[in-house]
């Protein structure tokens, strides 16, 4: 085995990040499609898009392109640099009138897994406006 050059490592990191963003954009566009009702499949896919957006940001910010291997939205958000957290919170601010973003993330930390298996639980709720605001804030922040 040979050592990768720094240039090759950078190219691999960039390709992984771009693939992650592409997947997030596909899932987000499906989950936020006009006229869609907030049903479990759309919510699960939207929360997965949020996860991928945060992982793409973590890859972008980390010199080695590393990210946390978890579905936990709160853990991923807290792993982001403070400036990224601040910008995302500011973008969501007007849509989180009932509770702060961190509370929403804590309540939906394992949302992707829970909403995939919604038939196993009795009752699940999510603020549709907050859900859409988070997806849009993350998508917009990843463009910068």
Regions found by a protein language model. Give the residues of each.
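Short, hydrophobic, well-ordered secondary-structure elements
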Residues: 39-59
């Amino acid at each position: 085995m040979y050592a990768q050059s720094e240039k090759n490592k950078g190219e691999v990191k960039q390709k992984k990040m771009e693939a992650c963003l592409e997947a997030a954009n596909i899932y987000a566009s499906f989950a936020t499609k006009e006229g869609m009702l907030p049903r479990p499949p759309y919510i699960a896919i939207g929360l997965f898009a949020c996860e991928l957006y945060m992982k793409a940001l973590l890859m972008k910010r980390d010199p080695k392109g590393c990210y946390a291997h978890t579905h936990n939205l709160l853990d991923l958000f807290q792993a982001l640099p403070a400036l990224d957290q601040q910008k995302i919170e500011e973008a969501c601010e007007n849509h989180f009138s009932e509770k702060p973003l961190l509370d929403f993330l804590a309540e939906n930390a394992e949302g992707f897994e829970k909403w995939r298996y919604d038939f196993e639980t009795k009752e699940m709720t999510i603020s549709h406006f907050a859900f859409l605001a988070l997806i849009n804030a993350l998508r917009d922040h990843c463009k910068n």
